[in-house]
Amino acid sequence: MQALVNKIWYEGHPLRWLLLPFSVLFALITAIRRSLFRLGLKSQTALPVPVIVVGNITVGGSGKTPTVIYLIELLRQHGFNPGVISRGYGADIQGVKVVTAVDSAAAVGDEPAMIVARTSVPMVVGAKRVDTAKALLAEFAVDVIICDDGLQHYALGRDIELVVIDGKRGLGNRHLLPAGPLREGAWRLNQVDFVVVNGGPAQANQFEMQLSPSAVLPVNPKAEAVFNPTQPVVAMAGIGHPARFFETLTQQGIQLALSHGFDDHQAYDKHVLCELAASRPLMMTEKDAVKCRDFAQENWWYLAVDAKLSPQFDQQLLSRVRSVAAAKQGKSHGV
């Protein structure tokens, strides 16, 4: 099914024409919803600290999670104490939940589990972004909130919008759902504060980001094995665009005996993965690793990657955060 969807969205499959009437209906519904917020008929909750929303206008992976981790580290390096909120996609969360390092991906979602495992950032997950943001502020002394994937959740007031685009797949056929991959029209890119292009050329007023492999690490934190870079591996990826991960492995000189793409947010079974690997080294993404660490074998590995952005991006982002923070502090003191 996913293969057919990709052909429709990214390869010009003629079935897209049959879906266009539904895309028109989707456009109408989303336009009405935006208008309700713009006209004040639905309320937007403003928060006392800067809110950065990191999202995309397409369905599927684009590199949001590495971008969120980059922002956490950048803000910390410059004296801020950021916190993160997320939906916790794939997890059955009642109300809101504080994410801890011992939480499983099944309990909090794979992206939140990965973000906290990497950064130990204060993080709260839940279905309603406003509730998660309020819980984060009540529980932790954070001075910036990063919302992981909430661009279309307009009830949450935001000060900075950052959109991440897949530089290889772009906006696909540029149609709205379901005929294309767009959640909102391409015009939305002209309204956000920052557009980050992951792994592709950036246009004027956009910023290029590269995901740089940093290390091959064991999925099982107690494993004592040493990775052999000359031994072919079985590669797997349960992300929005598995082919990108397999290409990265090949570029790193890692030989692939077999590659297998799973659905995004796939829940894994130990026996299925053991059968897939067949005693060979198994290589996966960091996002997959947090879902497999409790039952990982000695020769299971993941490739850690770090986002790289330009100093110009850093300067503009920090300047914007400082400006918003100063304005909100002045407002709270009646200045």
From Swiss-Prot:
GO terms for molecular function: ATP binding; tetraacyldisaccharide 4'-kinase activity. The keyword Hydrolase does not apply. It holds the Pfam family LpxK. Its EC number is 2.7.1.130. GO terms for cellular component: plasma membrane. Pathway: Glycolipid biosynthesis; lipid IV(A) biosynthesis; lipid IV(A) from (3R)-3-hydroxytetradecanoyl-[acyl-carrier-protein] and UDP-N-acetyl-alpha-D-glucosamine: step 6/6. GO terms for biological process: lipid A biosynthetic process; lipopolysaccharide core region biosynthetic process. Transfers the gamma-phosphate of ATP to the 4'-position of a tetraacyldisaccharide 1-phosphate intermediate (termed DS-1-P) to form tetraacyldisaccharide 1,4'-bis-phosphate (lipid IVA). This is Tetraacyldisaccharide 4'-kinase. The gene is lpxK.
